[in-house]
């Protein structure tokens, strides 16, 4: 099956409150599939978006964790690393967002989020392999309070070129795929941070990137997970100490 072209979710769910240090744990390993996230974490958002794209709202329970007031039971009973996202499934807990979104795509019903085309799948593997380096390149100047670096410009220019590799759509593999999920939650944040803190528009002069962002914002399964931009900025200032 080919990757879906811009799938969306029409399911409007009532989001559960985030669980803090005084909360009780869910009945772990009772056979329920649970996705543990934080509403404001870009890595957890990847898994959340993937869940929505697959239409798993009724099959994968969302459990929100308050990372600023993390319950001890999360690390003790659920996921020893204590990070989000994690997935409780088949009596095991898995983590690491880039691995997890591929696991969800491969092991649950719903539209396939990676193509069968060999060239596109190979490029998807390359994009996944580069995702952490891209994140580091974009966040490093913000965390060190430095100016827009050559590394930032080069990383964004590479992304612009990557978005032109296939001409059958505005996404990394032409048509929408899981590779887009791997990058969009990071782009959502750095676009805000660089605009407000460096007066730098990451999409300026990069029409492919601008179109990618515009098209991603039309996908409901992603749009449902977005936060208010100024809230994300304030949160990053206070907790990541970006400036």
From Swiss-Prot:
Glutathione binds at residues 70, 84, 96-97. SUPFAM superfamilies: GST C-terminal domain-like (SSF47616), Thioredoxin-like (SSF52833). GO terms for molecular function: glutathione transferase activity. InterPro entries: Glutathione-S-Trfase_C_sf, Glutathione_S-Trfase, Glutathione_S-Trfase_N, GSTL1/2/3, Thioredoxin-like_sf. Induction: By N-(aminocarbonyl)-2-chlorobenzenesulfonamide (2-CBSU). Leaves and roots. It is more strongly induced in the leaves relative to the roots. Residues 1-26 are annotated as: Disordered. Residues 109-240 form the GST C-terminal domain. Residues 31-112 form the GST N-terminal domain. Coiled coil: none annotated. Belongs to the GST superfamily. HSP26 family. This is Protein IN2-1. The lineage of its organism: Eukaryota, Viridiplantae, Streptophyta, Embryophyta, Tracheophyta. The gene is IN2-1.
């Amino acid at each position: 099956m080919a990757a879906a072209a811009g799938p969306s979710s029409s399911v409007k769910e009532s989001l559960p409150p985030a669980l803090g240090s005084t909360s009780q744990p869910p009945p772990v390993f009772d056979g329920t599939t649970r996705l543990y996230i934080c509403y404001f974490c870009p890595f957890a958002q990847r898994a959340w978006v993937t869940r929505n794209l697959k239409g798993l709202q009724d099959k994968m329970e969302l459990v929100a964790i308050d990372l600023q007031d993390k319950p001890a039971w999360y690390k003790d009973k659920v996921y020893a690393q204590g990070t989000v996202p994690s997935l409780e499934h088949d009596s095991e807990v898995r983590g690491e967002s880039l691995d997890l979104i591929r696991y969800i795509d491969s092991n649950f019903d719903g539209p396939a989020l990676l193509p069968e085309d060999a060239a596109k799948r190979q490029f998807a593997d390359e994009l996944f392999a580069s995702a952490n380096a891209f994140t580091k390149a974009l966040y490093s100047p913000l965390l060190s309070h430095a100016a827009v670096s050559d590394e930032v410009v080069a990383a964004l220019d590479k992304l612009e070129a990557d978005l032109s590799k296939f001409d059958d759509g505005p996404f990394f593999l032409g048509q929408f795929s899981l590779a887009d999920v791997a990058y969009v939650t990071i782009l959502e944040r750095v676009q805000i941070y660089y605009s407000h803190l460096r007066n730098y528009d990451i999409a300026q002069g990069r029409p492919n990137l601008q179109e990618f962002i515009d098209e991603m914002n039309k996908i409901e399964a992603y749009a449902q997970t977005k936060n208010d931009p100024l809230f994300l900025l304030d949160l990053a200032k206070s907790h990541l100490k970006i400036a």
